[in-house]
Swiss-Prot record:
Record-stated family: Belongs to the protein kinase superfamily. STE Ser/Thr protein kinase family. STE20 subfamily.
Phosphoserine PTM positions: S329, S398
Positions of the UniProt region annotated as Disordered: 410-536
Cysteines paired by S-S bonds: none
Protein name: Mitogen-activated protein kinase kinase kinase kinase 3
Entry function: Serine/threonine kinase that plays a role in the response to environmental stress. Appears to act upstream of the JUN N-terminal pathway. Activator of the Hippo signaling pathway which plays a pivotal role in organ size control and tumor suppression by restricting proliferation and promoting apoptosis. MAP4Ks act in parallel to and are partially redundant with STK3/MST2 and STK4/MST2 in the phosphorylation and activation of LATS1/2, and establish MAP4Ks as components of the expanded Hippo pathway.
Origin species: Homo sapiens (Human)
Domain Protein kinase, chain residue ranges per copy: 16-273
Organism ancestry: Eukaryota, Metazoa, Chordata, Craniata, Vertebrata
Record EC number: 2.7.11.1
Transmembrane segments: none
Positions of modified residues (N-acetylmethionine): M1
GO cellular component: cytoplasm
Pro residues bias locations: 473-487
Length: 894
């Protein structure tokens, strides 16, 4: 490239031939490429720009970067700006990043860490001598060449460009390596190149322990702790494993006071990095990557010994090809029609981005948050703004604003439709002072909403046939799956996902489009929408309803719970079961083969799917786990390839290199009894709450990191037994209240009183009641001020103060003639399950809408998140193998 150019506008493919994609980051893909003129290999980062982003500010930085030439710095070749893509061309480092390496090899040896630290310090010494800072030292930005040379990447031009783009996508991941003076820049008055030395110390710990300190904490929580005056610099956890020299090196690098922190030149004189260290150490590391020795990185799980009883990895449905006699209830299943369950207002969203990063036709089903453009307009700002922290804002404030920008803290709604009672709430009276007001959005009427059950199903009250539909902020829940009778159906021409029930929902679709104008033009361009998923044929235009269909016969598992997931690559839909024998899956697109596959060999009592992340309570110690679902399926395929002599169930779940370790324990969550997940409709935050033996943990979903992260740990005497554990969202509070019981009401017109723990309080503070708890089987928040409480044979619909909700369109009480075990809320009714069947009752009239009863079978609801899953066993043999059903449409419904 001509050195006179700072940002070339010519076609980069005239100079470089792309060979293969070698990486994918939060803001672009990285390709291995070859210079067509010289044959020299290069690494090219291709970044897709968003409209309005201007990189003129980095042109001077690009020119300056051409002067940076050092053996420990990735060489910068140049940049291209072509159409809406920015190409950054750099030196190719075939060994990969240290982060990629330790994911395969496990922790680096002390000598390897010393070698890498020395080379990193040499690169920083050069940069600092040129008056430059790196600002982003971490394992992911330290690369190895094929012959073991260490190179610093993503600084200078890349750091400046990353800074702008990170404001929208990746910024939240960086606080763990940041120095305290960076976090408190507003109070401390800026920072200098010594922040890079702090990052060297953190990176040394990262290479030794596979993650930086505080990595399990929510980024905001980590930043907050760093700004506290009593913050203590982190240390290596294992005192005996590492030498005194290593411990002292980390201590020196992590000197809290930057004025006392040694420079790169000074640290290069430390005995830890002045010992005999050769490039052969890095070459040994690369050899380990290319030829991993599984025996060297076993990370066995001492708490969870291998299962005592061998369970099959694959379970086939019985009588798959034999025509068998149907039970009485199965005959009725084919005759009784049900409306699909609907999303409740507090249910976390399930977004399914396609390979291009945009949502396809499934967007109309799963995407309920406003677009990024809406948020930018609402807050009067785009992606511009100061990233580096010598500006007027502290890092804490910048990250908080970034969370606002991403919708983590956003869009408060007006409460004009609330009852007068809610403005004099006995519940709110015990709540600490409200948070400062947040920006308000355009008001969208809320009177139409309500919803469903403990497994995050939903209800949005719809008018009866003939009544005009009213606008709603939350779109309908996905229609139930419709199963092919013999073989998978090739899905080509799907109906609009909003056309649930003929004309009535057609009007709903039109009104939804009016409220989401930013997506309208894109939808109009799609004459033929993509299928929602394989195994989910398009919903019929006419209102034929759905019914229960058998998906598995003779299941030997002791199942506790069920959910579902759509693979973003294949679009196949899977049922996921949590059982005593482990976590199993069933592909709804392969019911002609009908077999369950084991995904995880540990006992599972609760699970929940969030995007491509599976949360579970698993293992002998009942600990919260986080699983990467695509990785979990790949891992299962790896297990199938093992020799028959090595039963998969006897392999510890992390015997393979860390690269394949897709299931991780969430720290500080042992002996978890129950969990619940909720979305705050006022802010868009999504929370996971777990009840431990003597405390409660609250975690928040961090979208850029695609994981739940700890924000609160509250000591609390958990009731025993713990019958009730749900979160309730209240206005003007950042965190939801945690309901641990329900007692009889004491105030005027109060039918129930919620016993709650308040995470917003600065102390472990909870409501106390001198009245005994009622026998409540179910509590769920349908709307912001509408809660469904299930008591024995009765369902009461109350507000946050426990008073009955009265409405012409809604009965405040629904009565059943049996003991309710579980419920699912449908469009216009509640479906209650009992031991020998189920009954639906209308929200409007309390009249029976559906009923199925079979005294020869015992029924149990396994889950209703996206898909309603039902189990039945023979009454005369309750331990016999079970049959499994889902609420689904019929092939003949077209």
């Amino acid at each position: 490239m001509n050195p006179g150019f700072d940002l070339s506008r010519r076609n980069p493919q005239e100079d470089f031939e792309l060979i293969q994609r070698i990486g994918s980051g939060t803001y672009g893909d990285v390709y291995k490429a070859r210079n067509v003129n010289t044959g020299e290999l290069a690494a090219i980062k291709v970044i897709k720009l968003e409209p309005g982003e201007d990189f003129a500010v980095v042109q001077q930085e690009i020119i300056m970067m051409k002067d940076c030439k050092h053996p420990n710095i990735v060489a910068y070749f140049g940049s291209y700006l072509r159409r809406d893509k920015l190409w950054i061309c750099m030196e190719f480092c075939g060994g990969g990043s240290l982060q990629d390496i330790y994911h395969v090899t496990g922790p680096l040896s002390e000598l390897q860490i010393a070698y890498v630290s020395r080379e990193t310090l040499q690169g920083l010494y050069y940069l600092h001598s040129k008056g430059k800072m790196h600002r982003d030292i971490k394992g992911a930005n330290i690369l190895l060449t094929d012959n073991g040379h260490v190179k610093l990447a993503d600084f200078g031009v890349s750091a400046q460009i990353t800074a702008t783009i990170a404001k929208r996508k990746s910024f939240i991941g960086t606080p763990y390596w940041m120095a305290p003076e960076v976090a408190a820049v507003e109070r401390k008055g800026g920072y200098n190149q010594l922040c890079d030395l702090w990052a060297v110390g953190i990176t040394a710990i990262e290479l030794a322990e596979l993650q930086p300190p505080m990595f399990d904490l929510h980024p905001m929580r980590a930043l907050f702790l760093m700004t506290k005056s009593n913050f203590q610099p982190p240390k290596l956890k294992d005192k005996m494993k590492w030498s005194n020299s290593f411990h002292h090196f980390v201590k020196m690098a992590l000197t809290k006071n930057p004025k006392k922190r040694p420079t790169a030149e000074k640290l290069l004189q430390h005995p830890f990095v002045t010992q005999h260290l050769t490039r052969s150490l890095a070459i040994e590391l690369l050899d380990k990557v290319n030829n991993p020795d599984h025996s060297t990185y076993h990370d066995f799980d001492d708490d969870d010994p291998e299962p005592l009883v061998a369970v099959p990895h694959r379970i086939h449905s019985t009588s798959r090809n034999v025509r068998e006699e149907k039970t009485r209830s199965e005959i009725t299943f084919g005759q009784v029609k049900f409306d699909p369950p609907l999303r409740k207002e507090t249910e976390p969203h399930h977004e399914l981005p396609d390979s291009d990063g945009f949502l396809d036709s499934s967007e109309e089903i799963y995407y309920t948050a406003r677009s990024n453009l809406d948020l930018q307009l609402e807050y009067g700002q785009g992606h511009q703004g100061g990233y580096f922290l010598g500006a007027n804002k502290s890092l804490l404030k910048s990250v908080e604003e970034e969370l606002h920008q991403r919708g983590h803290v956003a869009h408060l709604e007006d409460d004009e439709g609330d009852d007068d009672e809610s403005k004099h709430s006995t519940l709110k009276a015990k709540i600490p002072p409200p948070l400062p007001p947040k920006p308000k959005s355009i008001f969208i009427p809320q009177e139409m909403h309500s919803t469903e059950d403990e497994n995050q199903g939903t209800i949005k009250r719809c008018p009866m046939s003939g009544s005009p539909a009213k606008p709603s902020q939350v779109p309908p829940r996905p229609p139930p799956p419709r199963l092919p009778p013999h073989k998978p159906v090739a899905l080509g021409n799907g109906m609009s996902s909003f056309q649930l029930n003929g004309e009535r929902d057609g009007s709903l679709c039109q009104q939804q489009n009016e409220h989401r104008g930013t997506n309208l033009s894109r939808k109009e361009k799609k004459d033929v929408p993509k299928p929602i998923s394989n195994g989910l044929p398009p919903t019929p235009k006419v209102h034929m309803g759905a019914c229960f269909s058998k998906v598995f016969n003779g299941c030997p598992l002791k199942i506790h719970c069920a959910s579902s997931w759509i693979n973003p690559d294949t679009r196949d839909q899977y049922l996921i079961f949590g059982a005593e024998e482990g976590i199993y899956t069933l592909n709804l697109n392969e019911l002609h083969e009908t077999s369950m596959e084991q995904l995880f060999p540990r006992r599972c009592t609760w699970l929940y799917v969030m995007n491509n992340c599976l949360l579970s309570i698993s293992g002998k110690a009942s600990q919260l786990y986080s699983h990467n679902l695509p990785g979990l399926f790949d891992y299962a395929r790896q297990m199938q390839k093992l020799p028959v002599a090595i039963p998969a169930h006897k392999l510890p779940d992390r015997i393979l290199p860390r690269k394949f370790s897709v299931s991780a324990k969430i720290p500080e969550t042992k002996w978890c009894q129950k969990c619940c997940v909720v979305r705050n409709p006022y802010t868009g935050h999504k929370y996971l709450c777990g009840a431990l033996q003597t405390s409660i943990v609250l975690l928040e979903w961090v979208e850029p990191m695609q994981k739940f992260m700890l924000i609160k740990h509250i000591d609390f005497p958990i009731p025993c037994p713990l019958r009730m554990f749900e979160m309730l969202v209240v206005p003007e509070q950042e965190y939801p209240l945690v309901c641990v019981g329900v007692s009889r009401g004491r105030d005027f017109n109060q039918v129930v009183r919620f016993e709650t723990v308040n995470p917003n309080s600065t102390s472990s503070w909870f409501t106390e009641s001198d009245t005994p708890q009622t026998n409540v089987t179910h509590v769920t928040q349908l709307e912001r001020d509408t809660i469904l409480v299930c008591l024995d044979c009765c369902i009461k619909i109350v507000n946050l103060q426990g008073r009955l909700k009265s409405s012409r369109k809604l009965s405040s009480e629904l009565t059943f003639d049996f003991q309710i075990e579980s419920i699912v809320c449908l469009q216009d009714s509640v479906l209650a399950f009992w031991k020998h069947g189920m009954q639906g009752r209308s929200f409007r009239s309390n009249e029976v809408t559906q009923e199925i009863s079979d005294s020869t079978r015992i029924f149990r609801l396994l889950g209703s998140d996206r898909v309603v899953v039902l189990e039945s066993r023979p009454t005369d043999n309750p331990t016999a193998n079970s049959n499994l059903y889902i609420l689904a449409g019929h092939e003949n419904s077209y």
